[in-house]
Structure formats: C-alpha cells, structure tokens
Amino acid sequence: MVLSFSGMNVKAKESETARYAKEIAELQQGTSPQEVIQSAKELAKQKHVTTESILKQFHSEITSDKVQGNVIASKTGLSVMGGSSGTKKLPKSVKGNIYYTNSYTAFYNHGHVGMYSAADKIVESVPGDGVRQIAYNGREVEDNSIVQTVSVTDTQKQAAADWAVSRVGDEYSFNFVNNRNTGHEGAKNCSKLLWSAFLLKAGIDIDSNGGLGVYPRDITSSPYTKTILTIN
C-alpha cells in the first residue's frame, strides 16, 4: 500500500504561510496578513522564487530587528510595552545629517530616523502625517539618540535632503519588510525616505545588510554613516 502525504504537505505550507504573514502583520501595525502575502507573491514573481521563501525572509529580517530593538531597550532601561516619544529635543545640525531615536509600536522598538533639511529643520516620515518638514526642536527623542553624518560630499548630502523635502506630503507606509522593492515616489516610511534620498542623489546604498527591507538601524549601522553626537 502506498501512502500519499502530498495533501498534508500542502496544508503544512499553507499553515506556515499564514503564520508568517500573521506574525509579520502584528509587527507592522497598519498592514494585514493578506497584504503581506500579496506583497510576497508579487516580489516572488519578480525574483522567480517561491512566495514561501520571500515570506520566510520577510519574517527572518523583521524578527531579527525586533530582537535587536528589545536588546537595546533592555540596556537603556526603556519599556518595550510601547508608546514613548522621548523627552529630549534634537539639536541643530548640518543639512543632510541624519538622526536616530528609539521608537515603539506593537511592543517593538523599531527605531525612527529622519534627516536635517536645514540647520534648524528636519524632514521625516511619520504615521498620520506622512512625509513632513518641521523645526528641529519640534521632534522629541529618547535618551541616547544619535546624530550621524553620511560619508558623501556636501553637495550630495544637500541634494539628498532637498529630494526628501520634495516628497513632503507623501503618505506614510507601514511596509518595512519590502520597502526596498517599492517605488521611490508615493507612500514611504522613515527609513525608506532616507534610503531613497541617498540612493538617488548620492548613488550609495545606506542599508547595511541589503535585505528585502531597510530598517532604521540598518541605516545607523551602515559603513556610510558615522555618529557625531549622542543626545543624553
């Protein structure tokens, strides 16, 4: 007698796909498991790989980032239970410099990055407003936030900042797991805004690991970025 396990294998794959999509969506507030799966399907088609392999990489990258974020939170004594916007103010800095602060949603310290569009202004993408430009001291940050310079020419830094400002009004996107593979125009999150700006205007990839998604800490750990100030 020959036993067939093909049906069981299909069900197992479906179950794993659903689990990955559900866990990813829980870490990306504002997205649904169905949207995650659709995004994976489209990217899998482009890359000629399986949807399951893309979902697995999405899941691996975002859970790894979560672990890193929670380690940082525990070292700094911050709660991972969400909500804090910080009590420190950003200082003035040079146009084209960037900043990073810890930031929480869905019990996950994903971090947040923005760019100086002038010595006294920043441009960033945030939920609700999308891409916006505000006064430097309008942004509250956590202790141990950092300001970084990017290793390109002043002209390139300024061009990157100007491009970011040109995107003011773009909506916010909660999609981090696949943001390297979406268009430079339209909805974008904080790390996608900076990544696109320097890719298009300075010709560099400031994503340190080159995964499917670029996260805030991927930028701060890039060989192109260097910390010049810690805020505490």
Regions inferred by a protein language model and the residue ranges of each:
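Sec-dependent signal peptide cleavage junction
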Residues: 3-22
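Residue-level preference for non-acidic, small/hydrophobic
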Residues: 96-99, 114, 164, 194, ...
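Short extracytoplasmic/periplasmic juxtamembrane "stem" segments immediately C-terminal to an N-terminal membrane anchor
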Residues: 25-26
